[in-house]
């Protein structure tokens, strides 16, 4: 599984899969706060939280005494998937693009879960109107066949021909499937359909939220939605939100499966129910 390799695990925020490797993982990775509006890491939320988040990153990159070397790249998900379906604020993404350009740092956007119409656009970063330096994509592009693609700007193309060769790379059937998937998505306006169905699903989830206070935060883009389950009886955090109810999520997942609905879990303490329905 690609995501369990040494390099990929070094970039993962979740500690669980990383523990067995311990010191073998790269120590050249610096994690930064993500614009998690419902539980803002700066205790602010909204536009103020976004502003402080960007200021923190900009100061870290420009301060020679910050103790952090200028990175080769900044890697980000425009919508966090396993992290709990957290959509990055669009102004934050624009600010991130501005900061990385000014610093001469490549911006890599991970679209493996969010790409190919899932969020109502072909790629989730398009909602912010930015252009990354590198885009990593997989999953949906292969139409169920194994295919992963890295798209990057010309100035990053320093490999010599054959330098990235491998026995199972460049599979012709998977590439043909990928081309067919992209044609289908465009010809059948799947992006527009996913955006409309996502609005519909969000609307119905918010109706349920009125009667069930355990549905703390409903978020996402298009048909990549998440519901953060909370314990209304617990002590609120600095923003006034109840604590995550991680024990409830698998119970909800199990009951939904009994009724023919497949859901995934993610987020802190596994407390986010993830909706990733078919796009068609």
Task: Label every PLM stretch briefly.
Residues 1-280:
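Conserved N-terminal phosphate-binding loop of PLP-dependent enzymes in the Aspartate aminotransferase
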């Amino acid at each position: 599984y690609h995501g369990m390799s040494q390099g990929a695990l070094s970039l993962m925020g979740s500690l669980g899969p990383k523990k067995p490797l311990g010191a073998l993982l790269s120590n050249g990775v610096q994690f930064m706060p993500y614009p998690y509006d419902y539980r803002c890491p700066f205790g602010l939320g909204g536009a103020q939280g976004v502003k402080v988040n960007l200021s923190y990153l900009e100061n870290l990159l420009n301060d020679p005494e910050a103790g952090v070397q200028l990175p080769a790249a900044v890697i980000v998900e425009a919508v966090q998937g396993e992290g709990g379906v957290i959509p990055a604020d669009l102004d934050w993404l624009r600010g991130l693009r501005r900061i990385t350009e000014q610093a001469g740092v490549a911006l890599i956007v991970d679209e493996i879960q969010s790409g190919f119409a899932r969020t109502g656009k072909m790629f989730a970063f398009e909602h912010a109107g930015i252009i990354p330096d590198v885009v990593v994509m997989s999953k949906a592009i292969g139409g169920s066949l194994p295919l992963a693609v890295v798209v990057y700007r010309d100035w990053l193309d320093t490999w010599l021909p054959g330098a990235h060769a491998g026995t199972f790379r460049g599979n012709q059937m998977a590439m043909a499937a990928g081309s067919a998937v992209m044609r289908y998505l465009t010809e059948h306006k799947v992006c527009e359909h996913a955006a409309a169905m996502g609005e519909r699903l969000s609307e119905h989830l918010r109706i349920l939220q009125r009667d069930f206070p355990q549905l703390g935060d409903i978020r996402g883009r298009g048909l990549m939605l998440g519901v953060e389950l909370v314990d209304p009886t617990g002590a609120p955090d600095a923003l006034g939100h109840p604590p995550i109810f991680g024990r409830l999520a698998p119970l909800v997942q199990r009951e939904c499966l009994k009724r023919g609905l497949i859901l995934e879990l993610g987020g802190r303490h596994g407390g986010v129910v993830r909706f990733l329905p078919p796009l068609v």
